[in-house]
Amino acid sequence: MSPEALSELISSIAHNLVAAGQAGALTDELIPPVDKLAVMRPKDRAHGDWASNIAMQLAKKAGMKPRDLAEPFAAALAEADGIAKVEVAGPGFINITLDSASAAAVVDTVLAAGAMTDTDKHLNKVNEYGRNAHLGGQTLNLEFVSANPTGPIHIGGTRWAAVGDAMARVLEANGAKVVREYYFNDHGEQINRFAKSLVAAWAEANNLGEAGYQTETPCDGYKGAYINEIAARVQAEAESDGVDLTALAHQDQGLNDDGEPLGEADTEVREEFRKRAVPMMFDEIQKSMKDFRVNFDVWFHENSLYADGKVDAAIEELKSRGDIFDKDGATWFESTKHGDDKDRVIIKSNGEFAYFAADIAYYWDKRHRAENPADVAIYMLGADHHGYIGRMMAMCAAFGDEPGKNMQILIGQLVNVMKDGKPVRMSKRAGNVVTIDDLVSVVGVDAARYSLARSDYNQNFDIDLALLASHTNDNPVYYVQYAHARSKNVDRNAAVAGISYEGADLALLDTEADGEVLAALAQFPSVLATAADDRQPHKVARYLEELAATYHKWYNVERVVPMALTDPETRGDDEARKALEIAKNPEPARAAARLKLNDAVQQVIANGLDLLGVTAPEKM
């Protein structure tokens, strides 16, 4: 019996007690929905397989003492099929012990779940176990990473890539249609600074400083070896196309008010670098994402909002709703009407659009585009965007939508890469960039994705490169993957020994260690549902670590494949030890049941790792 089935049984009993007049003043309307009646796993196995606090939840509404209300619940539960024992404990907890056959039914449930048919979307051989449709009918637009195209993806963006894709997979496993979207910021001042930085690098490489060209990176520009590399690529591409950058620079070069060179190439050459370098960065970012197993459905270019008139259209929409006004020569969004702490400029007094104007148009586009309009627009933003939440939610409300429902904003905290016990700086401007490709080259995709997805994005996170590269149980991804590989090895050994679980009697899974594994398997569906509802995919990783620990412990105390005298563990002259080891061998029926349990664990680990975008290895 699964935890969900127990919750449904408890809910049914509550309604029956109301009908029978055994629940005091309680009415059907006061009974919470089933998902609010979840059972818990007792810390002490002596207290049973599951525990419910429903009597304490409902006692006040019923006008009864918790223990007095718990008694009729316990009596009804004790009569249900699959339940071996029920006890009322403490202030009103109801402890439930399942019979072994009922507890073990989860094994059949896991292995009988249908295989996923969209195999091209999965890394592992996964099945439907754990999946549900409670988010069915919803289209969720999940925007993540969206780093500026002014350099390679740094470690902060890498965290969002791992978390965002894992979240998308978890949401899809709960029935939602998810549109993965990357917002490509190819409009605005940061692109201008990027182009200036490239021009300076090009001028320095071509010894144009003496001619009056600026070769120093602008103080607000971008530094790093990648700037020099891209500048050289732009120059080579331009020359191949017959474009003379030096001639363009000479054409641009002007004088300041004192008749001296400006020291900086201007519009023409800078535009040449911009139009060639931005697509180069776009291609590099796309490749990095693909190599990291993140496949976006939409690559949205900010420039298109202006080119297609979407910014003007969105502002007109807000104006028609009475939320736009003019002041001091500028155009403002009256966001204070919708809970923001101050009104926001959207068109400056010089006629230029403020950055927020694009945000307004982008949200409106997500909600009303022809293909896959979003029921919910989820933004995954860095810690430096915390101040944006108020204005974004106000804009959502101004469009007649519900903040927190139609728009959700998730803020991620910082990531530090540790070197010699100290954080490595990660600023693109400092030239000391830790990129997604750097991380993958050191620890691999599996370790990078798992480690970043297993940490709560609401908290700062330190990456220990040495730990992630290690093959020890201290490395979480290794620990979980090893559990899967170990289960595969059990299968291979069982095949050699001629053991099959065909017709296995799962009621023989009656030891304490068996029970712990069974309970862990039964919790996977609720973990998956909670991870989706809470937007916290790290809960899947933490569950996998608990399942792996439970499995490793079970493996060490409950033998699956009989050990023979020829096995390495029983070789040697110690006849007493060999006899003891052989005595531990399970009888064939129990071995078959344990083999089936082994394969159920294997399946759930494969399912869980797939949700994190991590492979489930056959061998390690």
UniProtKB/Swiss-Prot annotation:
It catalyses: tRNA(Arg) + L-arginine + ATP = L-arginyl-tRNA(Arg) + AMP + diphosphate. Keywords: Aminoacyl-tRNA synthetase, ATP-binding, Cytoplasm, Ligase, Nucleotide-binding, Protein biosynthesis. GO terms for molecular function: arginine-tRNA ligase activity; ATP binding. InterPro entries: aa-tRNA-synth_I_CS, Arg-tRNA-ligase, Arg-tRNA-synth_N, Arg-tRNA-synth_N_sf, ArgRS_core, DALR_anticod-bd, Rossmann-like_a/b/a_fold, tRNAsynth_Ia_anticodon-bd. A motif ('HIGH' region) lies at residues 147-157. GO terms for cellular component: cytoplasm. It is an enzyme of class 6 (ligase). Its main location: cytoplasm. PANTHER family: ARGININE--TRNA LIGASE, CYTOPLASMIC (PTHR11956:SF5), ARGINYL-TRNA SYNTHETASE (PTHR11956). This is Arginine--tRNA ligase. Belongs to the class-I aminoacyl-tRNA synthetase family. Monomer. Its EC number is 6.1.1.19. It is found in: Cytoplasm. It comes from the Bacteria. GO terms for biological process: arginyl-tRNA aminoacylation. It holds the Pfam family Arg_tRNA_synt_N.
